[in-house]
Amino acid sequence: AQSRFLAGYLGPLVRKVLVGPYREWTPVSPEQKKYWHPRYRAESLTALTRLVSWNHEINLAKLKIPVLILYTPFDDVVEVSSIIKKFNELGSKKKSLLSIPSKNHVLAGAITSPETTELVTQEMLKWIQGLNSKE
């Protein structure tokens, strides 16, 4: 909901009031602190929310390329119902929506989701190999 305010005409002003000059978060591990950027300029939030808003205007029925969407039903960053809705709008004949049992928005990687990295890798490889089939 906040993102709608940030994407609008008054987005920069709203951002300054709600966030200030920087967006900061606390890393959950020393590795995350080492390899991620937990502090960045808040202007990027306005740009990101405008990009997301623009994406909502795209006619996905016209999209005919193969699409694989991986998501977690536990996502606290993206609304899962929106992921499913957008997937159903895709005009692609070869499309797959795959739920990954990760507790994190980032579905794979040694730092945030080591328990699902192998699963994500295998599912992606299987999907890519399936592109050659004549379904």
Residue ranges with predicted function:
Residues 94-96:
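Short, conserved active-site loop motifs that form the nucleotide-linked donor/cofactor pocket
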Residues 57-61:
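Surface-exposed acidic, glycine-flexible loop patches that form ligand/cofactor-binding
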Residues 63, 69-75:
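Short beta-strand/loop motif that positions the catalytic acidic residue
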Residues 39-42, 77, 114-118:
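Soluble non-cytosolic domains of exported or imported proteins
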Residues 1-49, 65:
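Hydrolase active-site cap/lid region
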Residues 98-135:
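Catalytic active-site module of serine/aspartate enzymes centered on a nucleophile-bearing elbow/loop
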Residues 52-55, 67, 128-132:
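Sec/Tat-exported extracytoplasmic proteins
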